[in-house]
């Protein structure tokens, strides 16, 4: 009985500590670019980091345009991402 209780407590703590992060945890500023278009949201295809939306808190997070494998895994594509410096949480882990 104690073993079952310990396993349940350990599982609950693991879920709390390792919970699945959502893409909305790193907020970004959706602004208009100098060319009149709006910045690209995370997971959208891009050619340079200047096209991607910047995070609100630039000291705790960074943005960029990087190559990732999409779900179909045919070839790598460039997508916008925003990452949290402290948690290494990125909003573009898998392509959509």
UniProtKB/Swiss-Prot annotation:
InterPro entries: Cys_Knot_tox (IPR035311)
Major subcellular location class: secreted
Keywords: Amidation, Disulfide bond, Ion channel impairing toxin, Knottin, Neurotoxin, Secreted, Signal, Toxin
Annotated signal peptide: 1-19
GO cellular component, one term: extracellular region
UniProt xrefs under Pfam families: Cys_Knot_tox
Lineage top rank: taxon: Eukaryota
Cell compartments where the protein resides: Secreted
Keyword Secreted: yes
One Gene Ontology term of the molecular function aspect: ion channel regulator activity
Modified residues (Methionine amide): 94
Distribution of this protein across tissues and organs: Expressed by the venom gland.
Disulfide bonds: 39-53, 39-80, 52-65, 83-90
Domain notes: The presence of a 'disulfide through disulfide knot' structurally defines this protein as a knottin.
Known role: Moderate insecticidal toxin with probable ion channel impairing activity. In vivo, induces irreversible paralysis in sheep blowflies (L.cuprina), leading to death at moderate doses (9.7 nmol/g).
Protein family (similarity comment): Belongs to the neurotoxin 27 (Jztx-72) family. ICK-72 subfamily.
Name of the protein: U4-hexatoxin-Hi1a
Annotated organism of origin: Hadronyche infensa
